UniProtKB/Swiss-Prot annotation:
It is found in: Cell membrane. The lineage of its organism: Bacteria, Pseudomonadati, Pseudomonadota, Gammaproteobacteria, Enterobacterales. It is a multi-pass membrane protein. PROSITE patterns: COX3 (PS50253). This is Cytochrome bo(3) ubiquinol oxidase subunit 3. Residues 1-10, 74-81, 144-161 are cytoplasmic. The keyword Transport applies. InterPro entries: Cyt_c/ubiquinol_Oxase_su3 (IPR024791), Cyt_c_oxidase-like_su3 (IPR000298), Cyt_c_oxidase_su3-like_sf (IPR035973), Cyt_c_oxidase_su3_a-hlx (IPR013833), Cyt_c_ubiqinol_oxidase_su3 (IPR014206). The gene is cyoC. Pfam families: COX3. GO terms for molecular function: cytochrome bo3 ubiquinol oxidase activity; cytochrome-c oxidase activity. Keywords: Cell membrane, Electron transport, Membrane, Oxidoreductase, Transmembrane, Transmembrane helix, Transport. GO terms for cellular component: plasma membrane.
Amino acid sequence: MIKETMRNNKLFGLWIYLMSDCIIFAVLFAVYAIISSNFSTNLINHKIFNLSYVFLETLILLLSSLSSGMLTIQKNKNNIKIIYFYLLLTFFLGLSFLLMEVNEFYKLILENCSPSQHAFFSIFFTIVGVHGIHVFFGLIFILSILYQLFYLGITNTIRIRILCFSLFWHFLDIIWICVFTFVYLNGVI
């Protein structure tokens, strides 16, 4: 009974955190909508966004969501090798996504499309960057679970952490789908 209460408290706390993150991203999307409505972003978006590259980023992140979902399924089956596999797969897919995002930022800055050039670039870098920071912390979360799994084995506490991580990771995917649709697709199409 006490363990179930602790689990529910941790999940409730995570949901509160995720809802506060929703508010942050909602504000960022509102600012983006205001800025893009006052400026012809079509000229910028057609020149700077490589939709196939961003689609590959999206595909990688969605695959990481799939591996995270498989991790959640496996957490109760006590097969630690499979749990390691899905944690590492999710980590490397997330890292690939993050490196692609950093590469995209680097190319934009080389093309003189930095945040200091225009408000559009400022909000673009902010939205994508805030999402990237969340992915980075998700990767740290994976590393901490791997460390704990190595030293403690699979415990109820680790199962709860895996569930919390998976909820967080799926949240990041939902936010990225919004970024992809609202920022990239809306500007290019």
